[in-house]
Design a protein with these regions (language model features):
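Short inter-helical turns and helix N-cap capping residues of alpha-solenoid HEAT/ARM repeat scaffolds
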Residues: 11-12, 51-52, 93-94, 135-136, ...
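A structural feature that tracks compact, well-ordered secondary-structure segments
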Residues: 89, 130-131, 172-173, 201, ...
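Intrinsically disordered, low-complexity regulatory regions
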Residues: 364, 394-396, 416-463
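Alpha-helical solenoid repeat architecture
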Residues: 6, 17-29, 46, 57-69, ...
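Short, hydrophobic/charged alpha-helical patches characteristic of ARM/HEAT alpha-solenoid repeats
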Residues: 1-3, 15, 31-39, 54-55, ...
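Residues that form ligand- and interface-recognition hot spots within folded domains
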Residues: 8, 48, 90, 123, ...
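Intrinsic low-complexity tandem-repeat regions in disordered proteins
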Residues: 23, 41, 59, 63, ...
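Buried hydrophobic core positions in alpha-solenoid tandem helical repeats
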Residues: 3-5, 43-45, 85-87, 127-129, ...
């Protein structure tokens, strides 16, 4: 670094440029503070305003390479006074200089809200929106990416991006032929839409539906993922926005997307289906009718990553918590035993256990199908199941008094004996549920299936 710094001041322009490129490449692969410590940044910032376009590109490359590693290094770039010079470069006649500056600004803004605010305060947004309108593809991509990096941190920063008129220019670009540009545009729209209802409605009003749903089926998997993310970020806000997606055929597109994707690419689709189904029983039925349940269950069963299983469990819980019919649909595909198994598994993460437990409790609270409740009781083994078993017993105590045929099958299946064998404490909710269940059966049946009854009979014989 010490050897390269004097070359930045060389009289020969090509040597200056080569030195800057060398610095940029070194900084790009190392997060060491050498670039900052050798007072090279002020020299680069000065050169941004004075030198020719080739050197400007090289200098912006160095600033980008330094800023990308960490917030402290990005802050060092800000402290060197680079932002004003980089923003000025966005007005340069050379597209390459604009692109290099936009890229550096995006890296600075991407780290945290405070750094993004400094980029906003430097006046970058309106110029980045102008860059999106330029004919050069790479400049469009980098500018859209930089706007996304600004918008992602807070509603205020996303609103600043919207106020500059960005959505009107970004939205038509989702139909562009270039896959990388579509990817960046979708990423930016999703970062805007995620913050609030108003911002999501601004994105919707740019008439992205139903076009965006076509790109949930795009040949490029990254475009598909980012398009599904836009749908997810819009769906989560209100029933009206979720209904808009359903009305445009969004559920079928999302179900197909979840079925064809694997790994992390599935996550936006899984979450979007859960958000849509969470709002009302009608919207949940639209997901169930589109065969979404089986794909969510398949993800819960086959995906190796716990965070994907957690998302699937959450979505299943949102779909099954509305009515007995919704809950039975979950029971019919075998989702409840799997949720119970994951909730008690030692290999499951804490987040997965919590999501499975919440989903089970929400579904069981609406479940009136006695065979499914019976299966859950009999499948309960470890103390990890205790919280769920309490919810199941409470639900059985509500269902059983009104189901005479169910009482008989509950006894013959072994479910009643299992209930009586469960350890309970006097005065507990579990004890209360067991007493209600017992009161639905004749005393002879209760005695016969109570633990220790056979031993007491043998003692009578011996006597």
């Amino acid at each position: 670094m010490a050897l390269l710094r004097p070359l930045l001041l060389d009289n020969v322009a090509s040597i200056q440029q080569s030195a800057a490129l060398a610095l940029g490449r070194l900084a790009n692969y190392s997060d060491e503070l050498a670039v900052v410590q050798n007072e090279i940044l002020p020299q680069l910032v000065y050169s941004l305003g004075e030198q020719k376009r080739y050197y400007k590109k090289a200098a912006a490359f160095v600033l980008r390479a330094v800023a990308k590693h960490s917030p402290p290094l990005a802050q060092a770039v800000v402290d060197s006074g680079a932002l004003d010079s980089l923003v000025a470069c966005l007005e340069d006649f050379d597209p390459g200089v604009k692109e290099a500056a936009a890229w550096a600004l995006g890296y600075v803004a991407g780290h945290n809200a405070q750094l993004a605010s400094t980029v906003v305060d430097a006046g970058a947004i309106s110029l980045l929106v102008l860059c999106v309108q330029e004919p050069e593809l790479s400049l469009k991509r980098i500018s859209a990416s930089a706007l996304a990096d600004i918008a992602k941190h807070s509603p205020e920063q996303a609103q600043a991006v919207v106020d500059a008129g960005s959505v009107a220019y970004l939205a038509p670009l989702i139909a562009h032929q270039d896959a990388k540009l579509k990817r960046q545009v979708c990423a930016c729209l999703s970062q805007i839409a995620k913050h609030s209802v108003d911002l999501a409605e601004m994105v919707v009003e740019a008439e992205i539906f139903p076009k965006i749903l076509l790109y949930v089926k795009d040949v490029d998997q990254h475009v598909r993922k980012h398009a599904a993310t836009v749908v997810r970020e819009i769906a989560k806000h209100t029933p009206e926005l979720a209904q808009l997606i359903v009305g445009n055929g969004g559920v079928a597109a999302l179900v197909e997307y979840v079925g064809e994707s694997r790994g992390n690419n599935r996550l936006p689709g899984i979450m979007a289906l859960g958000y849509i189904g969470a709002f009302s029983e009608t919207l949940a039925l639209s997901v169930i009718a589109s065969k979404g349940l089986r794909l969510l269950f398949e993800a819960l069963t086959t995906e190796p990553e716990d965070h994907l299983k957690s998302a699937s469990a959450w979505s299943l819980g949102q779909l099954g918590r509305h009515t007995p019919e919704h809950a039975k649909a979950l029971a019919d595909i075998g989702a409840l035993p799997r949720l119970m198994e994951l909730q008690a598994s030692a290999s499951s993460s804490e987040d997965l256990k919590v999501e499975c437990k919440r989903a089970l409790k929400a579904i069981v609270a609406k479940l009136t199908h006695l065979p499914a409740l019976d299966a859950l009781v009999q499948g309960a083994g470890s103390t990890e199941h205790a919280g769920v078993v309490n919810a199941v017993l409470a639900q059985i105590s509500k269902v059983l008094p009104n189901d005479s045929s169910g009482r008989s099958s509950f006894v013959s299946s072994g479910g009643f004996a299992k209930v009586l064998s469960l350890p309970t404490e006097d005065g507990s909710e579990t004890r209360e549920s067991v007493d209600i269940i017992s009161s639905c059966h004749p005393d002879e049946i209760v005695r016969f299936y109570s633990p220790g009854y056979s031993e007491s009979l043998l003692k009578k014989l011996e006597a």
